[in-house]
């Protein structure tokens, strides 16, 4: 349990849980950074291989990063898609691949006993080295991604978010939609996939995270085997900083046949290494991050019933990700809900939080932190973030302390970079 005491000046002092995760860090012979945590409570090993190969690397082929990631387990020189799936299933292992704007992540979860881990790891390694991208699989993934695009077009929140990103980032690579578009996916060729694969799935572009019931010596062997599957290649260039688009109309209305209106409003936010990261995290918890306790929820949903749900957030990336407020409301209430959301934000910027609100936000963030690293998966996710974005090795050990050290003035100062009058607004619904 965390105990918090509030002092007269509005700062907060806490007896924070002293969570220590011993993260071992080294590089393989060909320079791939490795992050390892031994966790022996359960007989599981989790491995993540990350590449600087997110949708921001799509260039002129929207969706190619996602397409390539989905193709890796579709066939190798000696195994077809069914044989690959059977090899993982027969050992109880789970393989997955996913991307965001910055990265592609390949994950393996396996029992640690050699009779299960060795064949699962062997199959995982082969996918890195010997993926062949057969045409039959390309056709199959095309169909799957076109279905996903159709589902996206039928999901108001997903369609509004896609429009928000494309409007906010304009010509910046973060505007590239993860799923691509119908035309780009229909035109994907084997040559495009191979070019993306050979350019991005290389040692200079990679990072490895390992968590679980394994010794450091064995983890070093695992990392060497994985990195040895990769050509050396070249690292992707650092992502350029985005800037707010120069457009006359900041309100984008998208016609959609739904009874409710989905609204996104926001601006360019922060990169993950921004010095204001912690004041903004704590401040956002007060503004809209605490789903049932935030100012936005209290003013727009609880007091006036103008929306079904509302929240705000930052999505820090390698370069500046977005700051956003999102809500769903009835069409006839959309204008009032948007106006009140904007006014609530302006009031927060003008007055800042109270000492009591600061206490509550810290308590919520500090209190929820231990559970986020209680499992292998949670630790792996945190290590991916630390390794990929080159955060300090003691990031997890100091997280609660840094949350606790945030004061009212830091929040007020950090939030002055939020400019309501320049925000992009996307309203999706019947017009």
Residue ranges and their predicted role:
Residues 3-91, 122, 194-299, 424-431:
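His/Glu-rich zincin catalytic helix
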Residues 415-417:
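Short, exposed beta-strand-loop hairpins at the edges of beta-sheets
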Residues 110-112, 145-152, 243-254, 364-372:
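Short, conserved secondary-structure transition motifs
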Residues 37, 42-67, 81-127, 158-183, ...:
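M16 family metallopeptidases and their MPP-like homologs
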Residues 78, 128-136:
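Short, polar/flexible loop-turn hinges at active-site or ligand-entry regions and domain interfaces
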